[in-house]
């Protein structure tokens, strides 16, 4: 099993923590990670685009001129697609772009990105992140003590609301729990800051 250093909130190394090789030590599968990232990005699309077809455009109920005898082309409505201000043919309608991948694929992708971060030495384990009250300055001190100055995903245990509230005003910092951290979040971050309790939860969920 791989060992990573365990730090406290002041940046002092207090011990080490063993990581499960079946989760944090596998050969990353880039193809699977790519598929999951594309799936999660697709799910983020709003899909609220819409246009009006000829039945939705206002007006056009009356035939513009009689069928025969005018010398002009026959027309049934001024809202036909060929008219200016008419309905759109086969235009976009609101829809969801999201699609689901098999659970095994999603789990393998998570294991792959966690393993990649550990292998690249971009995985920082911390004993805990506890704050008496939501305080952005306190969270910034923790990051400074741990020499984290790049885009970071902080993974905490369930119920640690003060950590999330303390970090929400910091640029390039995102907080997630062990069960909500996504492959897209991990790929988009330069470093992972994970609490000891969150590591246990990750190993429990992905085992």
UniProtKB/Swiss-Prot annotation:
Sorted keywords for this record are: Ribonucleoprotein, Ribosomal protein, RNA-binding, rRNA-binding
Xref: Pfam families: Ribosomal_L4
Q: Name one GO biological process term.
A: translation
Q: Which GO terms describe its cellular component?
A: ribonucleoprotein complex; ribosome
Disordered: annotated segments:
49-78
Q: Which domain of life is it from?
A: Bacteria
Which InterPro entries does the UniProt entry name for this protein?
Ribosomal_uL4 (IPR002136), Ribosomal_uL4-like (IPR013005), Ribosomal_uL4_dom_sf (IPR023574)
Q: What molecular function terms (GO) are annotated for this protein?
A: rRNA binding; structural constituent of ribosome
Signal peptide: which range, if any?
A: none
Q: Which family does it belong to?
A: Belongs to the universal ribosomal protein uL4 family.
In terms of PANTHER family, this protein maps to: 50S RIBOSOMAL PROTEIN L4 (PTHR10746), LARGE RIBOSOMAL SUBUNIT PROTEIN UL4M (PTHR10746:SF6)
Tell me the subunit arrangement: Part of the 50S ribosomal subunit.
Q: What does this protein's UniProt record list under function?
A: One of the primary rRNA binding proteins, this protein initially binds near the 5'-end of the 23S rRNA. It is important during the early stages of 50S assembly. It makes multiple contacts with different domains of the 23S rRNA in the assembled 50S subunit and ribosome. Forms part of the polypeptide exit tunnel.
Protein name per its UniProtKB record? Large ribosomal subunit protein uL4
Its gene name is rplD
């Amino acid at each position: 099993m791989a060992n990573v250093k365990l730090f406290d909130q002041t940046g002092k190394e207090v011990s080490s923590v063993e990581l499960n090789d079946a989760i944090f030590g596998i050969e990353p599968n880039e193809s699977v990670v790519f598929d999951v990232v594309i799936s999660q990005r697709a799910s983020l699309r709003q899909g609220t685009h819409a246009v009006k077809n000829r039945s939705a455009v206002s007006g056009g109920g009356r035939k513009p001129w009689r069928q025969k005898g005018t010398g002009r082309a026959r027309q049934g409505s001024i809202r036909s697609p060929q008219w200016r201000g008419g309905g759109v043919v086969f235009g976009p309608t609101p829809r969801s772009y999201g699609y689901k991948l098999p659970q095994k694929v999603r789990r393998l992708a998570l294991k792959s990105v966690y393993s990649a971060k550990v292998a690249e030495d971009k995985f920082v384990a911390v004993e805990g992140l506890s704050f008496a009250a939501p305080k952005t300055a306190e969270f910034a001190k923790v990051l400074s003590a741990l020499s984290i100055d790049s885009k970071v995903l902080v993974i905490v245990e369930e119920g640690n609301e003060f950590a999330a509230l303390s970090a929400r005003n910091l640029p390039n910092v995102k907080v997630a729990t062990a069960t909500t951290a996504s492959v897209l979040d991990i790929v988009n971050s330069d470093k992972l800051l994970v609490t000891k309790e969150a590591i246990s939860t990750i190993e429990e969920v992905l085992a």
